[in-house]
């Protein structure tokens, strides 16, 4: 079975997810949508880039990364429902997104966190951690968690 993962080509995390999927999926991917059994809308907002005849004839999985309920407008709902006609199942990374979209679709929803590419994300070596704590005046006993992202929410 071959999966075509749609990269939105925005130089963002979804493009990296597509590249990593293609690199590490053990040959279960195709970069040719004609050969695909499944179309994975990894950047679901870019779904209109796929010809409707492909969306109609193939299995379609859409990833919904997050929804901010206060920003989910009537137009957002119309767009969701337009895409929903072609989607067979949804992938979401968290329960909150599943809870939200379960109210507007009857399609299967799979809650699966994203993977971590250990080739680019790894623990900081102790000597570097100590230097950073000193440089940024962080307590040596504290457990620190960092988030590094380009955020669409500002």
Q: Where do the language-model regions lie?
A:
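A short helix/loop element that forms part of the nucleotide-sugar donor recognition site in Leloir-type
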Residues: 122-138
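Donor nucleotide-sugar binding/catalytic pocket of nucleotide-sugar-dependent glycosyltransferases
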Residues: 88-102, 106-126
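Active-site proximal beta-strand in glycosyltransferases
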Residues: 38-43, 53-71, 89-91
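Catalytic phosphate/metal-binding cores of nucleic-acid and nucleotide-processing enzymes, i.e., regions
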Residues: 26-28, 60, 77, 132, ...
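N-terminal pre-catalytic "stem/leader" segment of glycosyltransferase-like enzymes
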Residues: 1-49
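Membrane-proximal helix-turn-helix segments that form the acceptor-binding/catalytic region
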Residues: 71-90
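Conserved donor-binding/catalytic core segment of Leloir-type glycosyltransferases
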Residues: 139-154
């Amino acid at each position: 079975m071959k999966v075509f993962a749609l990269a939105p080509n925005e130089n963002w995390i979804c493009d990296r997810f597509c590249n990593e999927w293609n690199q590490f999926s053990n040959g279960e991917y195709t970069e040719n949508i004609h050969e695909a059994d499944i179309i994975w809308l990894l950047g679901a907002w870019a779904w209109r880039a796929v010809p409707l005849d492909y969306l109609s004839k193939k299995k379609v999985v859409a990833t919904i990364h997050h929804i901010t309920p206060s920003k989910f407008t009537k137009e957002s709902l119309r767009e969701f429902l337009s895409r929903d006609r072609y989607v067979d199942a949804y992938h979401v990374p968290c329960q909150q997104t599943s809870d939200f979209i379960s109210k507007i679709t009857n399609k299967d929803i799979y809650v699966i966190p994203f993977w971590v590419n250990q080739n680019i994300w790894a623990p900081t070596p102790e000597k570097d951690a100590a230097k950073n704590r000193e440089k940024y005046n962080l307590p040596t006993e504290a457990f620190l968690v960092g988030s590094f992202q380009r955020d669409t929410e500002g």
